[in-house]
Amino acid sequence: AEVAMKGNWVISSVSYPGSDYIKVSSFEIADSQCFVGSTWKFVSNNNKGEMALTKTGCPAFSSPLTWYVNKEGNFVMKVLDAGEKAKRVREGYVLKVANQTENSFQLVDRITVGNSMADVVYQFQKTN
């Protein structure tokens, strides 16, 4: 799974299957919809990468990151410049990988909304 993720990607959509829009701060950085249009680069041989938010009206944010696919097949990511407030920088975020093809894949974050669980689906499209 890791080799297929190397390269440059853009998040083409962020959706909430089975739910309406959910106000969620993705990775303690910005509202999930601010990630639409964001650019991501994954380097597979050293498990490093970088990401940048590009959407107008959203915080300007870019950061190096580290990532790998664990033995359960989940994507583990740490956004290194998310600052002290992002206490999960140390252990990272674990997201499910879904619908992986040569040119696209999804990362699915399971979040708690009130008393129930919801999915946030980040749709990645290859840009080169």
Feature locations, PLM:
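Lipid interaction determinants
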Residues: 1-63, 71-128
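Extra-cytoplasmic beta-strand recognition segments
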Residues: 67
